[in-house]
Regions:
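Catalytic glycan-binding domains that act on GlcNAc-containing polysaccharides
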Residues: 1-122
Length: 122
């Protein structure tokens, strides 16, 4: 069973997600940039990965591509990805992972990290 609220293992992802949402879409759930859509600019690959994670945990819950336009479901997918790839809840890793993918490059995600952290401190 995967916890799909903003709090995972007692960790609150809401401040991180709020900052990323401001940068990615300015909060517009209808935002589209190529294959990336919704408030968190989620790709089809990420939806598939969330469904694979859910399947591996025995959950019957699945996400569709249209769920990316739903802010709540987008946040749920963010939390699922972080829970799987970032089990220690590192804010830095969460931001780099969101920008650069699972095999992110530190140098290439540095500017994005700085931008998100600036938004979080405002």
């Amino acid at each position: 069973h995967v916890e799909v609220s903003a709090k995972k293992n007692g960790f609150d992802w809401e401040p991180v997600m709020r900052a990323i949402i401001q940068i990615e879409s300015k909060g517009n759930p209808a935002a589209v940039n190529g294959p990336y859509v919704g408030v968190l600019q989620i790709s089809p690959v990420l939806v598939k990965e969330c469904n694979n994670i859910l399947r591996s945990t025995g959950s019957t819950k699945r996400y569709s591509l249209s769920d990316r336009f739903n802010a709540t479901k987008s946040k749920e997918m963010f939390v699922i990805i972080q829970g799987f790839y970032n089990p220690l809840n590192s804010i830095e890793k969460a931001i780099r992972l969101w920008s650069g993918g699972i095999r992110y490059n530190v140098a290439k995600t540095q500017a994005y990290l700085s931008k998100v952290l600036r938004h979080m401190s405002n």
